[in-house]
């Protein structure tokens, strides 16, 4: 086991895991890995290069060629600032579609593990606890009902001035859940030893406090 602690937080789309993970990292002074951003970056790059999302081998070969960097809450791809560009619904759907390919997932393993740096790391995604950091000191599966997640996503989009339809978002989330849970490579699941945090009725602050309390217990 590495001496550098990792808190691995997995969960479905729009479960709030990114918000919780980034705040936990901030409270602890740890580094933060948003693994979903990496898949969205591949989605954006593959769109620019005209690569079909069904072409796993070609997508896998694209990953090592990408110049990815995170600076002051901004995300760069080949020196272009793409923080907002990778957060569109269309890129999210594309990322979900290409994430089923083992070639893409294996190509990103090393990059994700490179974020494990002193004094510690909080990583969120779909397979952080089960595949990327199986030796994490704390494994959390953060979830919420599809209805609660769709409503959160709806409010996020409206707040950004992006038009959205709640019924469409709910259907999209249900389809992504089915795809994430049934894929052959690293399906979305509750990892062995993971603590399940149901956030449908929790505030962000309550969820963050729960994870921090679990972490203190884990290292005690």
From Swiss-Prot:
It is found in: Cytoplasm. Its EC number is 2.7.4.25. It catalyses: CMP + ATP = CDP + ADP; dCMP + ATP = dCDP + ADP. The keyword Transferase applies. One of its GO terms (molecular function) is dCMP kinase activity. It is an enzyme of class 2 (transferase). One of its GO terms (cellular component) is cytoplasm. It holds the Pfam family Cytidylate_kin. Gene3D superfamilies: P-loop containing nucleotide triphosphate hydrolases. Its main location: cytoplasm. Keywords: ATP-binding, Cytoplasm, Kinase, Nucleotide-binding, Transferase. InterPro entries: Cytidylate_kin, Cytidylate_kinase_dom, P-loop_NTPase. The keyword Ribonucleoprotein does not apply. One of its GO terms (biological process) is pyrimidine nucleotide metabolic process. ATP binds at residues 11-19. NCBIfam families: cmk (TIGR00017). Belongs to the cytidylate kinase family. Type 1 subfamily. This is Cytidylate kinase. It comes from Polynucleobacter asymbioticus (strain DSM 18221 / CIP 109841 / QLW-P1DMWA-1) (Polynucleobacter necessarius subsp. asymbioticus). The gene is cmk.
